[in-house]
């Protein structure tokens, strides 16, 4: 039985070694993960797609897909989550004492933008960012209806331990 096992192990190692192609001149060199020999020799730069625009909310999946072409999408059990998005509001925030910002996210729903374009001359992006989708309107309507039904934001239920710890 042991002889058959050793024979099987030897054949497996031999066939695995024969399956690897011989590489002249690279016998002792290791390559980094994900690099092929052609890329190392040609020194091809990594392909980078610039961000077209920046979304004001990551809940707007259509906007995230349109604007952030180079993000990595991770599938989680609950939902698909965007990974690698930058802080989009940092450059748009003004000082509190400077007065109202013309394109503030707190303006009326008719003038609210869904994203900010990177290029000033990109008319397609400007059109996309200026229009609110029906999905966003439905989400806002549902939130307003919930607020109206409950009389405000959801209240935390008190437990028996809350009653005991009151002063």
Swiss-Prot record:
InterPro entries: Endothelin, Endothelin_toxin_CS, Endothln-like_toxin. GO terms for cellular component: extracellular space. One of its GO terms (molecular function) is endothelin B receptor binding. The lineage of its organism: Eukaryota, Metazoa, Chordata, Craniata, Vertebrata. The record marks 73-74 as: Cleavage. Residues 22-45, 85-112, 140-167 are annotated as: Disordered. Belongs to the endothelin/sarafotoxin family. Residues 1-19 form the signal peptide. Residues 20-50, 74-167 form a propeptide. Residues 140-149 have a biased composition (Basic and acidic residues). One of its GO terms (biological process) is neuron differentiation. Residues 97-109 have a biased composition (Low complexity). It is found in: Secreted. Keywords: Cleavage on pair of basic residues, Disulfide bond, Secreted, Signal, Vasoactive, Vasoconstrictor. Endothelins are endothelium-derived vasoconstrictor peptides. Disulfide bonds join 53-67, 55-63. This is Endothelin-3. PROSITE patterns: ENDOTHELIN. The keyword Secreted applies. Residues 115-135 are annotated as: Endothelin-like. It comes from the Eukaryota. PANTHER family: ENDOTHELIN (PTHR13874), ENDOTHELIN-3 (PTHR13874:SF11). The gene is Edn3.
